[in-house]
Regions:
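Beta->alpha turn/N-cap motifs
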Residues: 1-10, 100-101, 109-111, 116-122
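Stable alpha-helical elements in mature extracytoplasmic
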Residues: 4, 58-62, 154-157, 161, ...
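Ligand-binding "clamshell"
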Residues: 11-23, 38, 110, 115, ...
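A conserved helix-loop-strand patch within extracytoplasmic ligand-binding domains
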Residues: 19-72, 171
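Periplasmic-binding protein-like
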Residues: 25-35, 60-67, 122-163, 165-187
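Ligand-binding cleft/hinge of the Venus flytrap
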Residues: 61-97
């Protein structure tokens, strides 16, 4: 499949006694912080509500992203599976509303800001470079990847698929058609 990053895959493996493995990183989908009302992070008022994903890996990722941008500080050693309870410093007393990933786009209307992937922002006609208050830097562990069962990851069919999706033609297609939502994660 192509819909998960390696940390989400590992959480799936742990929770389902599964053995999925990353075959090939495919593209980066960086989180962004979007607001319907505010145009910069400095405009986001004290006590504003920020919608974040409620599943463990994406919540942790969203909080790590906000920490990297200086919005909050997490307890030392929190790691990627942080929760709202791990927030140590929150200078503007933001409130964090945890919602299902599929609700984040709707929260664009209801919350002061929403942490979303480009795939959720695009249907709202939002792009990271023009509309996001903040955009996550690409992180290899979060690249959407071709994933397979461990027992067939090296099969000829899977390897042909990996080769096809990382071709120069696919790279060019992604760069030309999805520059802000699917930057190639392969060379």
């Amino acid at each position: 499949n192509f819909f998960q990053h390696s940390l989400w895959m590992q959480a799936f493996n742990d929770n389902n006694d599964s053995n999925l493995v990353v075959v090939e990183p495919f593209y980066h989908a960086e989180m962004g912080l979007y607001s319907k009302e505010y145009k910069t992070i400095d405009e986001l008022p004290e006590g504003a509500t920020i919608a974040v994903p409620n599943d463990p890996t994406n919540l942790g990722r969203a909080l790590a992203f906000l920490e990297a941008e200086g919005v909050i500080q997490l307890k030392e050693g929190t790691g990627i599976y942080g929760t709202v309870q791990d927030i140590e410093e929150n200078p503007k007393n933001y409130k964090f509303e945890e919602v299902d990933m599929l609700m984040l786009a709707r929260m664009y209307d209801d919350a002061d800001a929403s942490v979303m992937y480009p795939s959720y922002a695009m249907p709202l006609n939002l792009t990271p470079s023009k509309d996001a208050l903040l955009v996550e830097d690409p992180i290899d562990d979060f690249a959407i990847s071709l994933v397979a069962r461990e027992d067939n990851a090296d099969s000829e069919l899977i390897q042909k698929l990996a080769e096809a999706i990382t071709s120069p033609e696919v790279k060019q297609y992604l760069e030309e058609n999805y520059p802000e939502s699917a930057a190639p994660a392969f060379e």
